[in-house]
Structure formats: structure tokens, C-alpha cells
Curated annotation (Swiss-Prot):
Enzyme class: transferase
Domain Rhodanese: 14-137
Keywords: Selenium, Transferase
Protein name, per record: tRNA 2-selenouridine synthase
SUPFAM superfamilies, A to Z: Rhodanese/Cell cycle control phosphatase (SSF52821)
Organism: Salmonella typhi
Length: 364
């Protein structure tokens, strides 16, 4: 066990999905964490704030003494039991704090007193975070091919089928448009970047990689923005454009946004609350682009959406949604994407149907 007491091979830890018992305060964890980490704090937010204030006013010794007073007795025992349970569940796990300092060492010592020898991450979360940033920069230097196409072209599915494909929208938990949110909340920016770095490392490790295949994304995916090093490379990358018939795109969008999202909401919240959440989701997506549509057009499409929802609720049919989706594509989404694509016309290396692009990718 001695060789595991301090870990410095950060890439190996990230590649192995090493469980991390992260003892930072909840606010620190929410701001940024590694995939596979569970938050079992030594100090809660208010306790950490009090210790920090004490440190500034009275110094390190007084702050340490305050920390021990705050985390003692039943509180200390409850947290110790949680760490013990986590280590028993993840015996290959590591303790992690902000910089591999006192917090992880204190928890390690308390566990040792119970007979558990849990190693820690030397350098803590900060060292892992720096490793993730460096890995993304390094791996972003490899060639990139983008998959482009209007909304409903099946780009994400195509990317997912590639052994060297990176599903940026899946990592961001958002599909990129005003209707793009999923039932899972988006991660913080740092957590998204960390997850992306680990995904790049894993794909790179399991094959001889000639290039990445990514979806042609904007600078942001929902609330997350792409790392600048990756975005700069994507701006110059060649693009294969999917050009499927409009009717086929409509059917994909019907399945994804009206059938699947309705199912997901009702499965998560039950019929009544799920329907309400689904309805609010569609209304919110339309509301988010009201200024670009113009307020009169927004009001017209909202009325059409309301009628479509009433029809879906009464009969289960999603046909009514086509009456607002078709003009939304024709008047907003398609012109916007085509304008963006025109600016990158020199980068287009292939055009074809979804199947044409899939076959072309196999032949590369």
C-alpha cells in the first residue's frame, strides 16, 4: 500500500476512472470536479468560510484549532463513517482536496486511526485540473474533421458512431440550440472541461488516432463554452456536410424533441408534473429566441405550439407540432446555419446525405 500513499501519475489516474473521495467544501466541488469524484467534505461551506476568516485574522495555528473544534464529536464521527463507507465501496480510490494539503492529510490520518490506509492525490484537485488542461491542449493539436449540417441532420448520431468521434453535446449535456437542454443539469465550466479532457485521453489511448471527428459547434454549447485551444483548431478544420431531405430531418426532430423528451419528462416526474415540465420546456425554447423571431411571429408560433400541445395531450399525436416547427426551421434555424456555413465554405470537403457522409468517413 505504501506506493499508493501519494499519487503523481495524474494522466494514469484520469484514464483509469480512479474514484476520488473529494474532501473539499461543496462550493469548491460545484465550481469544478473530476469525473468519478464524490464529494464528502471535511468542512461544509460555512465551516470553511469561518476557518478562512480565522486564518486571515489570527494565523494558521488558530485556524487549524478552529477547524478541529468545528469538526468534532458526532459531526466528526458522521463524516468519518461516510469516508469509511466510500473507501469500502471504492478500495482503489484516493483522497483529494484542493492542493493535497492539510484537509486530505487530516482525513487520511483519521482513517488510518480506524485501520484504513487510503492514499491521497499529491497536489490535489489543482494538479489534476492542470493535467486536464494540458491534455486538452496537446490532444487538440491532432487533425480534426467536423460534421456539419442543418438542425435534424443526425450529426450527433454520426459522430457517436465514429471510433474517434467526440460527442461534445453529450459531454455538455446540451444539444446546442434554444431547445437543447436535457433533464440532466449542465456541469460547471471547469467540470465540463475536465470531462472533455478525460474523454480525449481515453479515445486517444485505445487506438492509433489519425484525427478527431467532432460536430460543427459554435463557441458555446448551452452554458458551457469550448476550450479556446480546441475552438481555434475547429475554426480551421475541414467540414463534411450532411444534406438530408427536409422531411427526414422533421422526423428526426419529431422523435428527439416531441416523443423522446415527452417520454423522458413523464418518466422522471410522472404524468401530470412530467407533462407540465415538457410543456414548459418547449415554451422556454421558443421564448429564448423571441427577439430574433420578432415579437409578433413569436406570439403566432406560441399560439400554434399551444394548439399542438393540446392535440398531443388529448390524442397523443405530435403532428400538430409540425405547424410551428416547419416555419421555425425555414425562417430561423436553417438560414442561420447556412449563413454560418457560407463563411466556412472553403473548409467544406464533402457534401451528401447522412448515409453518403457515413460511407465517406469509412473510406477515409
Amino acid at each position: 500500500m505504501q506506493d499508493r500513499q501519494k499519487a503523481q501519475d495524474y494522466r494514469a489516474l484520469l484514464l483509469a476512472d480512479t474514484p476520488l473521495i473529494d474532501v473539499r467544501a461543496p462550493i469548491e466541488f460545484e465550481q469544478g470536479a473530476m469525473p468519478g469524484a464524490i464529494n464528502l467534505p471535511l468542512m461544509m461551506d460555512d465551516e470553511r468560510a469561518a476557518v478562512g476568516t480565522c486564518y486571515k485574522r489570527q494565523g494558521a495555528d488558530a485556524a487549524l484549532a478552529l477547524g478541529h473544534r468545528l469538526v468534532c464529536g458526532d459531526i466528526r464521527q458522521q463524516r468519518l463513517e461516510a469516508w469509511k463507507a466510500a473507501y469500502q465501496r471504492f478500495p482503489n480510490g484516493y483522497l483529494c482536496c484542493a492542493r493535497g494539503g492539510q484537509r486530505s492529510h487530516i482525513v487520511q490520518r483519521w482513517l488510518q486511526e480506524t485501520g484504513i490506509d487510503c492514499p491521497l492525490i499529491e497536489g490535489g484537485y489543482k494538479a489534476l485540473r492542470q493535467t486536464a488542461i494540458q491534455a486538452t491542449w496537446q490532444l487538440a493539436q491532432k487533425p480534426i474533421l467536423l460534421i456539419g449540417g442543418c438542425t435534424g441532420s443526425g450529426k450527433t448520431q454520426l459522430v457517436r458512431q465514429q471510433p474517434n468521434g467526440v460527442d461534445l453535446e453529450g459531454l455538455a449535456r446540451h444539444r446546442g440550440s434554444s431547445f437543447g437542454r436535457t433533464l440532466k443539469p449542465q456541469l460547471s465550466q471547469a467540470s465540463f472541461e475536465n470531462k472533455l479532457a478525460v474523454e480525449l485521453l481515453k479515445i486517444n489511448a485505445r487506438q492509433t488516432l489519425k484525427r478527431w471527428v467532432l460536430e460543427d459547434e459554435g463557441r458555446t454549447i448551452g452554458a458551457n463554452h469550448l476550450p479556446e485551444c480546441l475552438r481555434e483548431r475547429m475554426a480551421q478544420a475541414p467540414i463534411a456536410v450532411v444534406e438530408d431531405p427536409f422531411a427526414l430531418r422533421l422526423e428526426r426532430l419529431r422523435e428527439e424533441y416531441f416523443i423522446r423528451m415527452h417520454h423522458d419528462f413523464t418518466h422522471a416526474y410522472g404524468d401530470g408534473a412530467g407533462w407540465q415540465a415538457y410543456s414548459e420546456y418547449l415554451h422556454h425554447g421558443l421564448f429564448a429566441i423571441r427577439r430574433r423571431l420578432g415579437l409578433q411571429r413569436f406570439a403566432e408560433l406560441t399560439d400554434t405550439l399551444d394548439r399542438a400541445l393540446a392535440e398531443q395531450l388529448s390524442s397523443g399525436s405530435t403532428d400538430g407540432h409540425m405547424a410551428w416547427l416547419v416555419p421555425l426551421l425555414n425562417e430561423y434555424y436553417d438560414p442561420m446555419y447556412r449563413y454560418q456555413l457560407e463563411k466556412k465554405a472553403a473548409n467544406i470537403v464533402f457534401r451528401g446525405t447522412w448515409q453518403d457522409v457515413a460511407n465517406w468517413l469509412k473510406a477515409q
